[in-house]
Amino acid sequence: MAVAFRGGRGGVGSGQSTGLRSFFSYRIFISALFSFLFLATFSVVLNSSRHQPHQDHTLPSMGNAYMQRTFLALQSDPLKTRLDLIHKQAIDHLTLVNAYAAYARKLKLDASKQLKLFEDLAINFSDLQSKPGLKSAVSDNGNALEEDSFRQLEKEVKDKVKTARMMIVESKESYDTQLKIQKLKDTIFAVQEQLTKAKKNGAVASLISAKSVPKSLHCLAMRLVGERISNPEKYKDAPPDPAAEDPTLYHYAIFSDNVIAVSVVVRSVVMNAEEPWKHVFHVVTDRMNLAAMKVWFKMRPLDRGAHVEIKSVEDFKFLNSSYAPVLRQLESAKLQKFYFENQAENATKDSHNLKFKNPKYLSMLNHLRFYLPEMYPKLNKILFLDDDVVVQKDVTGLWKINLDGKVNGAVETCFGSFHRYGQYLNFSHPLIKENFNPSACAWAFGMNIFDLNAWRREKCTDQYHYWQNLNEDRTLWKLGTLPPGLITFYSKTKSLDKSWHVLGLGYNPGVSMDEIRNAGVIHYNGNMKPWLDIAMNQYKSLWTKYVDNEMEFVQMCNFGL
């Protein structure tokens, strides 16, 4: 029983194995058959596609190109590859040649022959690029390349490339240098333009700051006037001081509308004077600031017996437009037009004339210096001081200087070719050219010792009037008092030692401290006045130490000194 059972199982397994072998053999046969058919089909298609361009000319060119790229990618033409490289070389060198030709034109080089060679070479490259053989071959339209034609084309392109390279190597250094020089010039020009603009803007800003009245100064003047109004009895005018006409004393003339500035000048003189009771100050201001000036010196009388006389321009009755040409000119329409209207002749059109826009040039206070002998007829000598100076030592030695019969004792400012008469006067005018030397050395207003007797003898005021009348149309000089001063006191000025008067503290940061320490008078000429926010800090303390900070109105007006 057991044997029969095993024999039955073995027969069934043998039948199943035979069926499986038959099935797998059939599948292998079918796979091999399909593989053979696929290879045969691919071979036929491949062979037919090789001959199709020569047999069927009715197919579109795009179809041919597509078939070529699809089935012949592995069979690229070596001539075609070389042609592409040659074409790229030609294009690159054409671009380079055109660039160097453009540089040559831009730099305006004298090598016109070289420029022409570059231009001719660029034309040759363009002609090569437009040749039918090269153009059609590069367009990839499937045309076969002839080796002879290709070699001729290749040689021609290589010759042009070689020529271009040689020319570029020869001229590269020169062109690069010239280009750098041109770029540097362009940069310098642009920077100079910016610098000029910045300087002019700075000059305008500085002028605006200089001509504007600071809030603190306005506050001080208003409070002083308010004090006068509140206490009229306290500030009645005192009788004239006999010292004002005593020729044996030391007399000073100060013409200003700036209360704090005048107080500093007077205080600096008194504090450094050996005998202050012998010093007399003649202060002249305008009608608007007269009350404020009087109240200041009433509230803060001078120490140690010094004297002060305060007047307004209007107190000198002889100063009217019929006598003083400058008053007549200041009222003229022409000068108003020159000063205020924005036309071609306006001073602001010329950066060198910006300074003439300062209101002081339209103030009679600025011209009073030419009438000193008539304003003080009983005096022999007088020291004229601007309101932007500080006196640092006793200056009575100025009265002892022998002026050799000259009218004006002043410090000369010329050095080299600077600050000569030619810079202040119009020497193209025949009258100026005939009467003055353009190389004559100029001097400075601000600290001048005047011999009034010599002035009267030389009739200097008449000379001033003569030239001022001639300059009504401003053809001899522009606005200002230094040019007419140079004319009036030409050959009548005694040069003083430079240590008496050191200038430039209002514009020149390079004035040495040694010069300043040794100076009798330091002068803040320029726009950076010490009472303004734009003052130079290194010099400001030399002025502020003479400000009367104990004065209550100075504290209330927040001078920030």
Curated annotation (Swiss-Prot):
The chain crosses the membrane at residues 28-48. It is an enzyme of class 2 (transferase). GO terms for molecular function: polygalacturonate 4-alpha-galacturonosyltransferase activity. InterPro entries: GAUT, Glyco_trans_8, Nucleotide-diphossugar_trans. SUPFAM superfamilies: Nucleotide-diphospho-sugar transferases (SSF53448). The keyword Zinc does not apply. May be involved in pectin synthesis. This is Probable galacturonosyltransferase 9. It comes from Arabidopsis thaliana (Mouse-ear cress).
